[in-house]
UniProtKB/Swiss-Prot annotation:
Protein name: Uncharacterized protein PYRAB14350
Subcellular location: Membrane
Membrane topology qualifier: Single-pass membrane protein
Gene Ontology CC terms, in alphabetical order: membrane
Key words, A-Z: Membrane, Signal, Transmembrane, Transmembrane helix
Species of provenance: Pyrococcus abyssi (strain GE5 / Orsay)
């Protein structure tokens, strides 16, 4: 019996028992996310769908008059419990205070970065764990959008990871959720991430590489009303994405400009050395670099010292050599 068949069979058995998954009690009437970055909106979608509550993207610094008018109308209907997704840098304390002054009861769930925010949300809404976990790259918005759709369909949490290695938050989330299978989505994840998960003892299934879509079936029968509700929900998602798209395009261009300016500080040789380290999972023995990039040991030593001064890498003594580790998130391509 092939490994692929066993994985498919396991996923189908998990899907049949998804109704046993217990989410946190529905204590919210509205989810608030920032309107200048799509990632928090995407990781909020599965929980919005799970609890059947809307998401409102807002200015992260302060509430404008139109948003306040919407919120006043909402609270007058008795819906006064708000969940803010993201830390104070994502949605400011000023916005939180404005909401409280309007009479809302505010809860905030956020981490140091988007991977930790995703972990905290997953553990909050699935305190008893989940037999299925969706994993996507924190920097590949397309894959995260697809991952959110799968998480909504299968009623399971979503975690985010770094591209070249499993993020500490995703690792902890997987351990605490203790799933039967971790489903990886998209091409923005390195195979070292999958290997790390498998070495932890979990089955993996890679949508976009193994089978697309996965053969997962649920026992829930969709009624006409459910179908209509689902269509309305996804229409709302589509409209929101259309509204946000000009902002996203602008931010993407600005990000690319900043990235280009950032990369200009590095020489061609420094970029080659950085690429070699990143492709090795973010750290490597210094003695291995000359063979990989083709530069002499003195040249490698000088490059590493320069990268240390720029705060990009750090070195740790290991026997007669050094372990060189990338300490700053950097995207070369």
């Amino acid at each position: 019996m092939s490994r692929s068949f066993m994985i498919i069979l396991t996923i189908m058995l998990i899907a049949l028992s998804l109704g046993e998954v217990l989410a946190a009690e529905n204590g919210y009437d509205l989810i608030i996310v920032r309107n200048d970055d799509l990632i928090d909106y995407l990781i909020a979608l599965p929980y919005s769908h799970l609890l059947d509550i809307p998401i409102l993207p807002v200015n992260p610094k302060e509430l404008d008059d139109v948003t306040k008018a919407q919120l006043y109308s909402y609270i007058q209907l008795g819906r006064d419990k708000i969940l803010i997704i993201g830390n104070n840098n994502a949605v400011s304390l000023n916005v939180e205070k404005e909401l409280e002054d309007m009479g809302f009861k505010v809860t905030r769930i956020g981490g140091a970065d988007r991977t930790e925010t995703a972990e905290k949300l997953a553990l909050h809404f699935y305190p008893n764990g989940s037999k299925l976990v969706i994993l996507a790259s924190a920097w590949d918005y397309g894959s995260t959008l697809a991952a959110s759709e799968f998480a909504m369909e299968y009623k399971c949490p979503i975690l985010l990871t770094w591209e070249n290695q499993l993020s500490p938050s995703a690792l902890e989330g997987i351990k605490k959720l203790n799933p039967k299978i971790v489903i990886l989505v998209g091409f923005g994840i390195n195979e070292t991430v999958e290997k790390t998960i498998e070495d932890m003892g979990y089955e993996t299934y890679w949508i976009g590489r193994d089978i697309e879509p996965p053969p997962i079936e649920t026992t829930t029968t969709t009624t006409p009303n459910q179908t209509s509700s689902s269509k309305s929900f996804f229409l709302g998602v589509l409209v929101t994405l259309m509204i946000l798209s000009p902002v996203i395009v602008y931010l993407w261009k600005k990000r690319e400009e900043r990235r280009s300016q950032f990369l200009e500080q590095f020489s061609e040789k420094e970029i080659e050395v950085l690429r070699a380290i990143i492709e090795n999972g973010g750290e490597i023995k210094q003695e291995e670099l000359p063979k990989i990039v083709g530069y002499s040991r003195p040249t490698i030593s000088r490059i590493i010292q320069d990268l240390e001064k720029k705060g990009i890498v750090e070195r740790e003594k290991s026997g007669k050599t050094f372990i060189v580790r990338v300490i700053k998130k950097i995207k070369l391509d």
